[in-house]
Amino acid sequence: MFFGKIAIYPYVRQTDISKSMQLSSEWYMAKCVKSTVEGRLTDKRYQKCVASLFCCVLLSFINSALAFNEAQPSHTQQAAPQASFATIPLIYIKVAGTSPPGTPDYLKSPSNEGTAGASVAIKDANITGKFLGYQFELTEVSVPTISELQASLAKARQHSGSSAKANHIEITSNQQSNIAPVVLLDMRSSDEVEAASIEQLITTIQSTLPNAVFFNVTNSDDLLRQNSCRLPLFHTIPSYQMKADALAQWFRTKRIDEIFAVYGKTADDAAYLAAFKRSAKKFKLSLVETKQWQDSFDLRRAAFAEIPQFTRTTETYQAVFTADSAAQFAYSLPFNTYYPVPVVGAAGLKALGWHFTHEQWGARQLQSRFNDAFNRHMNEVDFAAYLAVTAVANAAQQGSDLKQQGILNTLLSDDYTLGAYKGRPLSIRPYTHQFRQLIALAHEDALVTHAPLEGFLHQTNELDTLGAPHTTCKDKL
């Protein structure tokens, strides 16, 4: 571009005409002032310079005015209608119960355990849901026992066919839109009576919410997975068999063969011990002795003095396995056994679905967001609830409709996988509805490794070296 004999090089992008004109104007103004002061311009060249400057300023004003007019909304333009979202009801049912009197306060579960993980997942899912047309809404139901919840639901169903109330929280059927409610079950039990109660509870809820999809986020009982395999129930918490197999793989890797087992009096403790016995048989470990913890010990008064005597056996052992779901004794065993050996299970080296020191594969940002939101670490129950919500949201993102059968078909399809900060895609075992996943082997302050460990292979999926039963639905373990 030339003005007179002075060339201006097009160093400004053509898309920014206003800026280009402004820079050209400033450059010419400076040039004209300099030329006038030095007296080097003739009158004719001065007039050309002034004319060029005027043209640049005029073009700049015109472009600014056009841009301003385009930015202003038209008075006749109608406001865009707001998008309508399909609401996915998320009901978190928690059977709180009471902690035994001997459980230390620092080992008790947080009051918002599970619901905190679900809340983080809902926040993430609703961001994507704004573009796909769905939103999760969380409702919490807390009762002391399963039987009380069943009674509340049955009584409310007699008075109203469309809704039920439990603990003053309404559970409403969503049959008008056929959107499947997502029910997260937070209840621990491991004997046949309680497992049957959970199945009956699901049946009771189905009478109110016939199209619901259920997720078990706390119960690790293998019996529940076998007996409820025909229900629309998925298990995001690892089973006891998965945890026991992970510990057994670690024992084989460390060449530890002789194990002494100590277990508590709860049904969960018996279930964990039974799973470890199956793992010991599968991986050819030897259980030298098995003892049940005695409540007569007063750890606060005796200051752990009786622990070495209790852990004394007729045969030597190389490790101690503990099953203590109520946190009554296992915390007192590390570095206090008769033989100086590692403790695993409920204390020492634990097999967990999630540990707060896990930071690989993007897990660090999830840990940070959870810690910022709730000022505590994320545990395996929180992650199981997070995983349940994420699985449903992921199914919706893959194009599944929000009806029960659509979600079930997506989750149980052969090619379904889910990324969940564990380094390997998660999938679901069709015969037990258990989520395949890595198991974290960790102690109180650090992550040791993830199972399955190197060298343990499977013909189809290495994650099936952890807890995959060689049985079919309804077969006995």
Where are each of the predicted segments found?
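N-terminal secretory signal peptides that target proteins for export/translocation
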Residues: 1-46
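Extracytosolic ligand-binding ectodomains
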Residues: 2, 66-477
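N-terminal cationic leader/targeting segments used for protein routing and processing
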Residues: 6, 20, 32-35, 45, ...
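Small/flexible residues
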Residues: 7, 15, 42, 47-50, ...
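Hydrophobic alpha-helical elements and their junctions with loops/disorder across both membrane
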Residues: 14, 37, 58-59, 163, ...
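Intrinsic-disorder-associated interaction segments
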Residues: 22, 51, 456-459
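Disulfide-bonded cysteine motifs in exported proteins
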Residues: 27, 44, 50-51, 224, ...
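Bacterial N-terminal signal peptides
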Residues: 52-61
